[in-house]
Amino acid sequence: MIGNTKIKSLLEEGLTAFQLDAIGDLLLDFLLLLNKWNKTYNLTAIRDIETMVSKHLFDSLAILPWIKGNHIIDVGTGPGLPGIPLAIAKPDLQFVLLDSNGKKISFLNEVKRQLNIKNIEPIQIRVENYHPNQGFDTVISRAFSSLEQMIKWTEHLVAQDGLWLAMKGRFPDTELVPIHQTYRVERYAVPGIEGERCCVLINNTNKE
C-alpha cells in the first residue's frame, strides 16, 4: 500500500533521530491498528495518520531519557499514549496502562494480543480506586489539566523515591506555583511538531 509506504518512511526518519530504528515495524503495526479502531471507536481526536506519527508516537518516545526505574504506570493512557510506544522501545520495563474507558482498554488488550507485547498490563479502573501492592518508580501522564491535580489523584501510586513525569506543551509557569515537591522542567523537540514541548519531572520529596 502506497499510504503505508509513506507512513513507514516518516516513521523511519524520526526513529533514526531517536536512534530507535529497530522498533519501526512494531510501531507501524500499532499505528495502523490505532487508525483502524479510531474510525469506529473514536479513541483519539487526531484523524490523520501522518499527524499521529509525530503527535502520538514521536511525542511519546521523546520522554524516554527521563523515565526512572523498571515499574512504570501511564495514568489516563487513552489508546496507550505514551505507554505503548514506550513499552515497545523498552521491553525490559513493565508498564501498567490505566484508564476508566472500556473501549480504550479493549483496544489495548487487542494491541497486546496482536502485537504480542508482553510488558504491558491494561487495567480499566478509575485512578482513585486503583491501589496496587507496590508504588511505581515513574508515574506518567499527559491527561491531567494541571500538575496539582496530577499529584492529588496519583500520590498513592508513586513509590517513596519515585517520580512523576507530566507531559506538557508550553512551560507551565502557573501550574508550578503550588507544587511543594522538588522538580525540574526539561524542554524537548519532537520531529514533525512545531511549538514548545516540555516534561515536568517531580520527585516524591518535598522542597527543603
UniProtKB/Swiss-Prot annotation:
Belongs to the methyltransferase superfamily. RNA methyltransferase RsmG family. HAMAP family: 16SrRNA_methyltr_G (MF_00074). This is Ribosomal RNA small subunit methyltransferase G. It catalyses: guanosine(527) in 16S rRNA + S-adenosyl-L-methionine = N(7)-methylguanosine(527) in 16S rRNA + S-adenosyl-L-homocysteine. InterPro entries: rRNA_ssu_MeTfrase_G, SAM-dependent_MTases_sf. GO terms for molecular function: rRNA (guanine-N7-)-methyltransferase activity. The gene is rsmG. It is an enzyme of class 2 (transferase). S-adenosyl-L-methionine binds at residues 76, 81, 127-128, 142.
